Design a protein with these regions (language model features):
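N-terminal Rossmann-like dinucleotide-binding module
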Residues: 1-47, 321
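Hydrophobic residues in well-ordered beta-strands that form the structural core
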Residues: 53, 93, 118-120, 249
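C-terminal helix-rich "cap/oligomerization" subdomain common to oxidoreductases
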Residues: 58, 67-69, 219, 288-327
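Rossmann-fold dehydrogenase core element
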Residues: 105-123, 144-146
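Predominantly a Rossmann-like dinucleotide-binding segment in NAD(P)-dependent oxidoreductases
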Residues: 124-196, 204
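Contiguous beta-strand/loop segments that form the cofactor/metal-binding neighborhood of enzyme cores
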Residues: 183-257, 273, 285-294, 326
Length: 327
């Protein structure tokens, strides 16, 4: 598929590098757009992209572009995705999809109306290790889920700190990395939580969250704890406890390894390495769905995306945390 990239930041560079390595699969980078021509030109030169533009509008209007990867800050996702869809482009939008569920619903409806593919780029959902984990849970290998814990933290600094904390850009730990925790819990349970309690939250001087600890209860009684912070280094680990065993993931984001322990058996280390860096699976899924004429993925569905968007929105509303310009 012929890709355009909207924005030229760090995550866009990772996406471009991944597509570069997927040329044999038919993936191509054909255009990039930025608000600044110099940025677009430098990006295009780095990744051998034939065309560069100094506006998102001209990128979206390029007739050679089939699909666009949206890599702008959180609060811009809605308007950027809408622009691309209205110009007849398939869209893969960086997570978090939108800052509120109403925006998300509008975009998915627009994609259906225009018969275009739209998916949130929540890459960990499609990792091979999680396919294996789903199989283990479905087989009842560790019994019924009883308790899940997951944590993710890093220290945002420099220019990255300004963007991560900026209320006008939809900053804060919950939307930036908490989505990994909450998405991981949805991978395991396949459900919305019945109850969400904020045990701790810290809102910084910028008006965004840099730390929170959530307690969630799922149908069937499974309890979960999610810790997310952009002010402290935490290992990205997770533990799943069932009635007959447990699973430990030393890194549940870049998930390639887990240890399965079942009563009466020796611990088993399961490895499912990625082909490139993990982004390749969302790119393959987008191409697969476009070829099949689908408007959404049947693996990471619009319903899953909407559920996570709603969960994060309701959580931050319970904190009284609104982004700059948000009613």
């Amino acid at each position: 598929m012929k890709w355009g990239i909207l924005a030229t930041g760090t995550i866009a560079k990772k996406f471009a590098s991944t597509v570069e390595q997927m040329g044999a699969e038919g993936e191509q980078l054909v255009a990039v757009g930025s608000r600044h021509l110099e940025s677009a030109q430098a990006f295009a030169q780095q990744y051998s992209i034939p065309r560069c533009y100094d506006s998102y509008e001209t990128l979206a209007a390029d007739p050679e572009v089939e699909a666009i990867y949206v890599a702008t800050p959180n609060t811009l996702h809605y308007e950027n995705c809408k622009l691309c869809l209205e110009q007849g482009k398939h869209v893969l939008c960086e997570k978090p999809f939108t800052i509120d569920p109403e925006q998300a619903q509008q975009l998915y409806r627009l994609a259906e109306e225009k018969h275009l593919f739209l998916m949130e780029a929540f890459w960990i959902w499609l990792l091979p290790l999680y396919d294996r984990l789903r199989e283990i849970l479905a087989a009842g290998t560790i019994g019924e889920l009883k308790q899940i814990t997951c944590q993710y933290g890093f220290v945002a600094s420099g220019a990255r700190k300004n963007r991560k904390f900026d209320s006008g850009l939809g900053g804060g730990a919950l939307l930036d990395i908490g989505i990994y925790n909450l998405g991981f819990l949805r991978i395991l349970t396949g459900q919305d939580p019945e109850k969400v309690e904020t045990k701790e939250v810290h809102i910084n001087e910028y008006g965004t969250d840099d730390y929170s600890r959530l307690a969630l209860t799922y149908p069937g009684g499974c309890k979960a704890e999610s810790v997310q912070t952009i002010g402290q280094e935490l290992e990205r680990n997770a533990r799943i406890l069932g009635t007959k065993g447990s699973i430990f993931l030393p890194d549940f984001q870049h998930a390639e390894t887990m240890t399965l322990e079942v009563e009466g058996k020796e611990p088993e280390v399961i490895r499912c390495p990625v082909d490139i860096n993990g982004f390749e699976y969302e790119i393959r899924e987008a191409s697969r769905c476009v070829k099949l004429g689908r408007t959404g993925s049947d693996r990471y569905t619009p319903q899953d995306s909407l559920a996570l968007t709603r969960l994060m929105y309701d959580t931050r509303m319970s904190w009284g945390m609104k982004f700059a310009g948000e009613v």
